[in-house]
From Swiss-Prot:
Gene: RH3A
Protein name per the record: DEAD-box ATP-dependent RNA helicase 3A, chloroplastic
Transit peptide feature, positions: 1-41
Keywords attached to this entry: ATP-binding, Chloroplast, Helicase, Hydrolase, Metal-binding, Nucleotide-binding, Plastid, Ribosome biogenesis, RNA-binding, Transit peptide, Zinc, Zinc-finger
PANTHER family assigned: ATP-DEPENDENT RNA HELICASE DBPA, ATP-DEPENDENT RNA HELICASE RHLE-RELATED
Organism name: Zea mays
E.C. code: 3.6.4.13
Bias (Gly residues) ranges: 641-650
Amino acid sequence: MASLVTLPAIAFSNPATASGAVRLRAAAFRCWALRRRGWAVAAAVASPNSVLSEHAFKRLQLGSDDEDEEGPYGSDADEGFQGDEEELAIARLGLPDELVATLEKRGITHLFPIQRAVLIPALGGRDLIARAKTGTGKTLAFGIPMIKQLMEQDDGRSTRRGRTPRVLVLAPTRELAKQVEKEIKESAPKLGTVCVYGGVSYNVQQNALSRGVDVVVGTPGRIIDLINGGSLQLGEVQYLVLDEADQMLAVGFEEDVETILQQLPADRQSMLFSATMPSWVKKLSRRYLNNPLTIDLVGDQDEKLAEGIKLHAIPLTATSKRTILSDLITVYAKGGKTIVFTRTKKDADEVSLALTTSIASEALHGDISQHQRERTLNGFRQGKFTVLVATDVAARGLDIPNVDLIIHYELPNDPETFVHRSGRTGRAGKAGTAILMFTSSQKRTVMSLERDVGCKFEFISPPSIEEVLESSAEHVIATLRGVHPESTQYFLGAAEKLTEELGPHALASALAHLSGFSQPPSSRSLISYEQGWVTLQLTREPGYGRGFFSPRSVTGFLSDVCSAAADEVGKIYITADENVQGAVFDLPEEIAKDLLTMEVPPGNTLTKISKLPALQDDSPATDSYGRFSNDRGSRNRRSRGGGASRGRGGWDTDSEDRYRRGGRSLRSDNDSWSDDDWSGGGRKSNRSSSSFGGRSSSYGSRGSPSPSFGVRSSSLGGRESSRSFSGACFNCGESGHRASDCPNK
């Protein structure tokens, strides 16, 4: 529960709010009472120097017994109150008809809670600090009240050449700046709005400002350049917005922001939007905001993601990620837009290139020119391709409507990054899906992520071949329905001829070819996900055999039944069911077919499976994020319990998956053991290792990754290398440490 504060008596500029302090104390008490009764009231937390917005509470989620109480802005504001849905209708908010019309034309008929909570105090001239979850409509929260007041002030000023801006919006990234510009332009096309940022022509932006402007949106670096060059005058700025203020700190803009704020008129209205409140943001608000009202729609909630985002986590081997990625997109995106987040520029390029053979995709990262970057984003927005593979440069401020799927190809560097990556879907109240890929050694990291973010993953397996085929067919059918009728006329003759010859098989063949399955799909291992491999399950009934059931027992069994299978067996895992002795293992498809036709010893069952049972998990785990997660391990350490392999099974070396840190070349999570690190023959046991025939068999024990535990440093040839963190903690909001190192967790 938000703590209640003693509110000082405040002189309101609005005569209708003269007795506001008394009513605000009553609002605070009613909020406390509603929380006691179990109401999910969004927190509007007041600092000692701010006013608690009773109106924000009432408009969000108060009960019917409060409907007739007079709010701090007078009973006139509440006249005709009929409930949340009707009260959030923009047509009932007293906005200019022109603004209402443009919003409705864009399909915006109701406000979201953060927009409604901000509207009244913003129109009253209050300085604001607002917190809300990613994707909840913060841009229009400050945009609507500013546009309303600019429209009402307009006396022909918006057409005057050379006019200086009345609104300044600062954003940490060019993508966010462009998104804010787009929202304001589409909502108020008659206002002159200019977006300025680095990486593009300075002269073009100078010329745009010289023609006259009402709203300037930009990144701090380019804003300062234009101020120093005399192209941008801030003397008439009435409204300042700091959007995603906490990220100004993360990207190193704190000095630039303070320099800009010192250039602004003292009598302006300021609004600060920030997901977290690190110490720098608090200092900024104390120094540059006037008695700000804090509207907090996050409060102490553990859940940092917007509602409607379904979270999945999928365990994979490092070398199987690219194989499975296209199948995940096919099944879970359902033909919609997907953003795949990688850790490095190299990965983004390589993953995009690998996907292009089956799915149209483009890469987006820091080495791409601004011109190409804008072409790529526009193409993605327009649906010219459906998959964008991006580094975290795109996670902040990238606002693309109707993104259906987010895939974390690599673990994020910290929980904050996970939230903002995932927040690219499920925006504006829509549903979305986010899938986290991880290796077995990173399972503890995934659990830590659940704890830090306050979310819960549904653990899934890779889609089956049948699921991929079914989804592919649905996508192709949807595409065929979009073909223009005039185009089909040219192919009717050929279609009729084929139908006469082949019947329904003609259409089936066309669907298969368009889906990318001109040839039958090969089988795929459920363990390593390699094409051409099959996963079998061996089950032994109680009372049969002697000794402990182990991978060695499985290789002994295979040696007795089929020597070729024993020579080629891949990964072997023991099942977790305590009541049944069993194991799963991989074999090449042809050998598996032969093995399934052979007779097995009594009490044993051998089957081909389409879904993995629960397995024993004895692999070591890390508890670190992203690049600080060490999955390289010790080559001298043998795997414990659950997994062993023989022959060519197991993990392959991917020499391409390297990254550099501290001047040294290291392997990333995509590294694995080479066959040189493991001998297929292994060592012979001095005792019988198989209970299926008393024969001594040998197996190879693979080296198991032995990660280093620690977020800050990893061993680099005996030397310690640490990376400083300049951002803000996701848990407490203070700078200088990550959530995993937070002393307050």
